[in-house]
Amino acid sequence: MTRIGTPLSPTATRVLFCGSGELGKEVVIELQRLGVEVIAVDRYENAPAMQVAHRSHVINMLDGAALRAVIELEKPHFIVPEIEAIATATLVELEAEGFTVIPTARAAQLTMNREGIRRLAAEELKLPTSPYHFADTFEAYSKAVEDLGFPCVVKPVMSSSGKGQSLLKSADDVQKAWDYAQEGGRAGKGRVIIEGFIDFDYEITLLTVRHIGGTTFCAPVGHRQEKGDYQESWQPQAMSPAALAESERVAKAVTESLGGRGMFGVELFIKGDQVWFSEVSPRPHDTGLVTLISQDLSQFALHARAILGLPIPLIRQFGPSASAVILVEGQSTQTAFANLGAALAEPDTALRLFGKPEVNGQRRMGVALARDESIEAARAKATRASSAVVVEL
């Protein structure tokens, strides 16, 4: 029986976020609407979710002692990891001591590292995946590339948003892909996964929410990546009934194994009726930003309900919808966005500007959203809206 108290009072229901990016920001807003007291934690000040939380803390989240100190100080009812780069061993300890980690500390620990989740999916759950090897040294990596053949893909086992990821097409790429992977890992140099390339027709994110009443799937989200980073997404992605049924089977198997309650972003490769498991995030997914315009309950609202043990009787999808990111390149701590009237001039469009405090290189600073009569029209409209935004550094 869910009971929510009064924020900033002894009856408050407290939720603490480990990571305070744009996805967390939307979940915080949903929790604020339900009268939840929210604490946002990240490694830098004024992170997006901090701007809408009751209070915030800045710590190195890979420092287990610092993470424990904040959690023991705040005594949250729910701990919500929003990113992978967290001292997950500390979350496991805290969960054993009685804290609730969303969805589970094991899910956070397994998905922080591509090896944990790949071995779970392929070796324990026997789900279809690309052929793969792991390697710690250049020698082992070279042998894996030789074994899998070209083309193949290399990624650091610990990285996100495409960092350190390369597609190898010939022997000329072997050294530079290794060097790039060593630069791109979250915890510095280290282990990589080498995957055989799947010649897929398209890739999807199946947003899968585990809640008090069971497991519910959102309509499949199609997306386009560049260098492993999402550029645009759309919903619903057209699929054969067989491919959709197999996608739901795979997503249910992996999310059931990870357990707990919350939103999961299950990434899958599709070719005809065939489905391969790629990755899973035990939290809302960047490609799922499209649900801010495509569904009555966005992935963020669904995550909030699942966390609090509230029912999800139905998810209503509004038809062809798309998102296009607003990518900013350069250096600034005072970025401004202009020409917004033009960006929002067409019907059924929306913008989210994330409020990130700085840009240093390339950074996703917002997203344009659109609905239309077809996926093609929705994608074109979202791209027009995104392109219309003028960025001032």
Swiss-Prot record:
Positions with a binding annotation for N(1)-(5-phospho-beta-D-ribosyl)glycinamide: E22, L23, E82, D286, K356, R363, R364
A UniProt-annotated Pfam family: ATP-grasp
Binding site for ATP: R114, K155, S160, S161, G162, K163, G164, Q165, E195, G196, F197, I198, E203
Span of domain ATP-grasp: 119-308
Gene3D superfamilies: 3.40.50.20, ATP-grasp fold, A domain, ATP-grasp fold, B domain
SUPFAM superfamilies, alphabetized: Glutathione synthetase ATP-binding domain-like (SSF56059), PreATP-grasp domain (SSF52440)
Top-level taxon: Bacteria
Keywords: ATP-binding, Ligase, Magnesium, Metal-binding, Nucleotide-binding, Purine biosynthesis
Gene Ontology CC annotations of this record: cytosol
Pathway(s) of this molecule: Purine metabolism; IMP biosynthesis via de novo pathway; N(2)-formyl-N(1)-(5-phospho-D-ribosyl)glycinamide from N(1)-(5-phospho-D-ribosyl)glycinamide (formate route): step 1/1
Alphabetized InterPro entries for the sequence: ATP-grasp (IPR011761), ATP-grasp_carboxylate-amine (IPR003135), ATP_grasp_subdomain_1 (IPR013815), PreATP-grasp_dom_sf (IPR016185), PurT (IPR005862), PurT/PurK_preATP-grasp (IPR054350), PurT_C (IPR048740)
Class of the enzyme per the UniProt entry, highest EC level: ligase
Any one GO molecular function term: magnesium ion binding
Keyword ATP-binding: yes
PROSITE patterns recorded: ATP_GRASP
Keyword flag ATP-binding: yes
Function recorded in the entry: Involved in the de novo purine biosynthesis. Catalyzes the transfer of formate to 5-phospho-ribosyl-glycinamide (GAR), producing 5-phospho-ribosyl-N-formylglycinamide (FGAR). Formate is provided by PurU via hydrolysis of 10-formyl-tetrahydrofolate.
Subunit relationships: Homodimer.
Alphabetized PANTHER family for the sequence: FORMATE-DEPENDENT PHOSPHORIBOSYLGLYCINAMIDE FORMYLTRANSFERASE (PTHR43055:SF1)
Name of the protein in question: Formate-dependent phosphoribosylglycinamide formyltransferase
Organism: Pseudomonas syringae pv. tomato (strain ATCC BAA-871 / DC3000)
Lineage of source species: Bacteria, Pseudomonadati, Pseudomonadota, Gammaproteobacteria, Pseudomonadales
